[in-house]
From Swiss-Prot:
The chain crosses the membrane at residues 2-22. This is Cell division protein ZipA. SUPFAM superfamilies: Cell-division protein ZipA, C-terminal domain. GO terms for cellular component: cell division site; plasma membrane. Interacts with FtsZ via their C-terminal domains. Belongs to the ZipA family. Residues 49-88 are annotated as: Disordered. GO terms for biological process: division septum assembly; FtsZ-dependent cytokinesis. Keywords: Cell cycle, Cell division, Cell inner membrane, Cell membrane, Membrane, Transmembrane, Transmembrane helix. It is a single-pass type I membrane protein. HAMAP family: ZipA. Pfam families: ZipA_C (PF04354).
């Protein structure tokens, strides 16, 4: 029996449809294999990426703040920023006499305890990444110098919070760690700390939430050595900020001995910085 044109077209159509179905099945199977391979590669690479990021972050360097000038915050509620060892004890002894002796007690706003703020925050369980037993925290260099400039108000009412805040913000200081103000490399508040400003009256902190009702008789600017990479420039910025505050708010500059700060005193501070840099160069050699 001869096969007609109609039968041939049916056979050819069946073959073409079968070929299309087979090709689609083959492509689908191949794409599954590629997808699985990509997922396995991503999963395998994930721990390594986390490890690299953790190395980039690294341990942050902490900064010690003076405990003098009436600056004695509650260390149990505040983050630890102290330097360990004999240098800290020696430094505390040297700075004990920086507190101001005022004739009349002045009402100052006290910052809300950090522990109360923490209680309001949601608690999450955090996982600690196990570190090798042999790894130890990097020791920071001992603090050698504190350069302190105290600005005392000539008015009995002291420095009012809003005016004080405006002056120091214009000088580039930003509110930060330990509830005090810091001048960073960047005016945006980034980079290393050049110098800081604390309330000269206990507890030494500021409360931004109550700044409109805040007042203080004095504030303390201080620069830590070793600290900024360019201490001379940092010191000049600190002097400029202290002078600006004194001129605008009728204040008086005093040194760490509570004596009136003169041009000779500032030059003596500059010499202390030069001596420190000379010692640093000698140690490097």
């Amino acid at each position: 029996m001869e096969i007609g044109l109609r039968e041939w077209l049916i056979v050819i159509g069946i073959v073409v449809i079968g070929g299309i179905l087979f090709d689609g099945w083959r492509r689908m199977r191949g794409s599954k294999g590629k997808l699985k391979f990509k997922l396995e590669r991503k999963i395998a690479d994930a721990p390594e990426a986390v490890s690299e990021n953790s190395e980039l972050l690294g341990p942050s360097r902490s900064v010690d703040f003076p405990q003098g000038a009436g600056f004695e915050p509650d260390e149990e509620n505040l983050p630890s920023l102290s330097v360990r060892g004999p240098s800290r004890r020696r430094l505390d002894d040297e700075l004990d006499d920086l507190g101001l002796e005022l004739d009349e007690p002045v009402h100052t706003a006290v910052a809300e305890p950090v522990s109360r703020l923490r209680a309001a925050e949601p608690k999450f369980e955090s996982r600690r990444i196990e570190q090798p037993e042999h790894s130890e925290p990097r020791e920071l260099p001992p603090i050698e110098e504190y350069l302190v400039i105290i600005v005392v108000s000539r008015d009995g009412a002291g420095f009012k919070g809003p005016a004080l805040l405006q002056s120091i913000l214009e000088s580039g200081l930003r509110f930060g760690e330990k509830d005090i103000f810091h001048r960073h490399e960047s005016l945006a508040g980034n980079g290393e700390v050049l110098f800081s400003m604390a309330n000269a009256l206990k507890p030494g902190t500021f409360d931004l939430d109550d700044i409109d009702h805040f007042s203080t008789r004095a504030v303390s600017f201080f620069l830590v050595l070793p600290g900024p990479r360019h201490p001379k420039q940092a010191f000049e910025l600190m002097v400029a900020a202290a002078r600006k505050l004194a001129q605008e708010l009728n204040g008086e500059l005093k040194d760490d001995q509570r004596s009136v700060m003169t041009a000779q005193t500032i030059e003596h501070y500059r010499q202390r910085i030069a001596d420190f840099e000379r010692r640093q160069l000698t140690h490097k050699r």
